[in-house]
């Protein structure tokens, strides 16, 4: 059970990092 929660948190962190990187690059292109 704990392993599943840890996996979900890891996935959420990875998704947030990817989204932040994507938006960051988009912002750089707009400038």
UniProtKB/Swiss-Prot annotation:
The keyword Membrane applies. One of its GO terms (cellular component) is chloroplast thylakoid membrane. The chain crosses the membrane at residues 3-23. One of its GO terms (molecular function) is electron transporter, transferring electrons within cytochrome b6/f complex of photosystem II activity. It is a single-pass membrane protein. Pfam families: PetL (PF05115). Signal peptide: none annotated. GO terms for biological process: photosynthesis. The 4 large subunits of the cytochrome b6-f complex are cytochrome b6, subunit IV (17 kDa polypeptide, PetD), cytochrome f and the Rieske protein, while the 4 small subunits are PetG, PetL, PetM and PetN. The complex functions as a dimer. Component of the cytochrome b6-f complex, which mediates electron transfer between photosystem II (PSII) and photosystem I (PSI), cyclic electron flow around PSI, and state transitions. PetL is important for photoautotrophic growth as well as for electron transfer efficiency and stability of the cytochrome b6-f complex. This is Cytochrome b6-f complex subunit 6. The gene is petL.
């Amino acid at each position: 059970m704990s392993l599943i929660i840890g996996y979900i948190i890891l996935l959420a962190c990875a998704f947030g990092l990817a989204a932040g990187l994507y938006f960051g690059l988009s912002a750089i292109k707009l400038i």
